[in-house]
Amino acid sequence: MDKKKILLLSDDLRMSSGVGTMSKEFVLGTLKHYDWVQIGGAIKHPDEGKIINMNDSIRKELGVKDANLTIYPVSGYGSQQLLREVMSREKPDAILHYTDPRFWGWLYEMEHEIRQEIPIYYYNIWDDWPAPHYNENFYESCDLIMNISKQTVAIVKEVAKKKPRTDWDCTYLPHGIDEKQFYPIDKFGDEYKNVEGMRKQLTDNNIEFIVFYNNRNIRRKLPGDVVLAFKHFCDQLPKEEADKCCLLMHTQPRDQNGTDLPVVAKTIAPDYKVYFSDQKLTTQQLNYLYNMSDVTINMAS
């Protein structure tokens, strides 16, 4: 039987954003079962206007002989015109969009047109109260809502009063990771030498406890609050123990969408060690960072 084709609207799965990373995970993880087309967004996409056929590379990488993935890069989130063109060319069996529905106003303005032909699915990561009742019309326009957490399921059911959701069209589908890429590294194995090498490169020999932050330097990710929280943590320790702790921030130290983190650290935590990892890393290198860290902190809203 021919595989169904899904049209994904989200961050370009080749990008390193959280949405892009998870888009890549569930697309590559299901290529045995579905063909995929993506309208892949970025702030200013360098490939805008191109059509990227990924078949050869993913078939070689995954060993799936009939894997099919095509990406239509776009700056921003796309448009009605682009969607109509892609639907006409690719003839998908369903549309799946991933991230805040308020970014997809143009999509929901044409939902009556789309749903005469194919369903709209929404992968929902809204997991914080109070319930966003202003999303009710968006939820009503989705044939299936897949939710990142059980709390997200509860939020959707609280919001969707005009069209109550059922267990069939409002499901729990949590994030996952590829355990072949992210895994604990045996401290007595040869690979751990790479972890120690990265530790020496990014911190100093006196460090015994690492607090790890892996997010963009933007206001929503609260990097300044993380520095302040680390300062309060160290304040509660004897000086000799605090001197052995560090905050390792894998982010751009300075970003026009965020703040000047070296200045923030020097101003509010001058007595403590804050280090930065600002180079683009491979998945393997990122796994080394997680293995060398004692705790990961994420205060993002």
Language model regions located:
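Short His-centered aromatic/hydrophobic patch
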Residues: 97-103
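Nucleotide-sugar donor-binding and catalytic loop/hinge architecture
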Residues: 1-4, 165, 184-210, 237-242
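Nucleotide-activated donor-binding/catalytic signature segment of Leloir-type glycosyltransferases, i.e.
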Residues: 70, 249-253, 258-288
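A conserved, positively charged/aromatic
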Residues: 115, 122, 131-147
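Carbohydrate-associated surface elements
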Residues: 151, 176
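Acidic donor-binding loop of glycosyltransferase active sites
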Residues: 288-301
